[in-house]
């Protein structure tokens, strides 16, 4: 049940990317974009936990936010951006995928 719900949620995000987002100019302040973040969070943590992270990301994406690189956390925590959290991760200057590729060289 959870896997099928996850697939439905990912399908909804992909539908948004193809039908709505494709017809508007790029305006996301974050990398990866909010929709790509949602897909990665859903794939990594499932429908419920990934959905929670996606909603929290959408709440952070507002006109007065700084934006920047905001990868899906390596360990699940809704508090990963707070310094007092055990799962705290500092925002990166380079995307995580780039950092991992350079480490493999």
Curated annotation (Swiss-Prot):
Assigned keywords, A-Z: Cell membrane, Membrane
Primary localisation category: membrane
GO cellular component term, pick one: plasma membrane
Membrane association type: Peripheral membrane protein
Compartments in which it is found: Cell membrane
Keyword Cell membrane: yes
InterPro entries registered for this protein in UniProt: Membr_insert_effic_factor_YidD
Membrane listed as a keyword: yes
A Pfam family assignment: YidD
Disulfide bonds: none
PANTHER family linked to this entry: MEMBRANE PROTEIN INSERTION EFFICIENCY FACTOR-RELATED (PTHR33383:SF1)
Family statement: Belongs to the UPF0161 family.
NCBIfam families attached to this UniProt entry: membrane protein insertion efficiency factor YidD (TIGR00278)
Function per UniProt: Could be involved in insertion of integral membrane proteins into the membrane.
Protein name: Putative membrane protein insertion efficiency factor
């Amino acid at each position: 049940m959870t896997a099928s719900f996850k697939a439905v949620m990912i399908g909804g995000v992909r539908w948004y990317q193809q039908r709505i987002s494709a017809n508007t100019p790029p305006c996301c302040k974050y990398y990866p974009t909010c929709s790509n973040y949602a897909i990665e969070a859903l794939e990594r943590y499932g429908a419920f936990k990934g959905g929670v992270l996606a909603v929290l990301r959408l709440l952070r994406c507002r006109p007065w936010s700084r934006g920047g690189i905001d990868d899906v956390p390596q360990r699940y925590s809704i508090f990963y951006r707070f310094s007092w959290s055990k799962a705290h991760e500092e925002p990166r200057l380079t995307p995580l995928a780039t950092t991992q590729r350079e480490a493999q060289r």
